[in-house]
Amino acid sequence: RCLHAGAACSGPIQKIPCCGTCSRRKCT
């Protein structure tokens, strides 16, 4: 399970990581 592009993120360490990377508080 991971967050898709456009989802809000707080950084590399979070409960559900981004599928890609976290940039400007948004998953890319």
Swiss-Prot record:
Keywords: Disulfide bond, G-protein coupled receptor impairing toxin, Knottin, Secreted, Toxin. Expressed by the venom gland. GO terms for molecular function: toxin activity. Disulfide bonds join 2-19, 9-22, 18-27. It comes from the Eukaryota. GO terms for cellular component: extracellular region. It is found in: Secreted. Negative results: does not show activity when tested at 100 uM on mammalian sodium channels (Nav1.1, Nav1.2, Nav1.3, Nav1.4, Nav1.5, Nav1.6, Nav1.7, and Nav1.8), potassium channels (Kv1.1, Kv1.2, Kv1.3, Kv1.4, Kv1.5, Kv1.6, Kv2.1, Kv3.1, Kv4.3, Kv7.1, Kv7.3, Kv10.1, Kv11.1(hERG), GIRK1), a calcium channel (Cav3.3), and nicotinic acetylcholine receceptors alpha1-beta-1-gamma-delta and nAChR alpha-7. The letter 'N' in the name stands for the Greek letter 'nu' that has been chosen as the activity descriptor for melanocortin receptor modulators. Since it is impossible to search for Greek letters in databases, the UniProt policy is to write all Greek letters as their full names (i.e. alpha, beta, etc.). Toxin that acts as an agonist on melanocortin receptors (MC1R, MC3R, MC5R, MC5R). After binding to MC1R, the peptide activates the hMC1R/Gs pathway, but after binding to MC4R, it is not able to activate or antagonize the MC4R/Gs pathway. Inhibits melanocyte stimulating hormone (MSH)-binding to human receptors (Ki=1.8 uM to MC1R, Ki=19.8 uM to MC3R, Ki=7.1 uM to MC4R, Ki=10.0 uM to MC5R). This toxin is structurally unrelated to the natural agonists. The presence of a 'disulfide through disulfide knot' structurally defines this protein as a knottin. This is NU-theraphotoxin-Preg1a. It comes from Poecilotheria regalis.
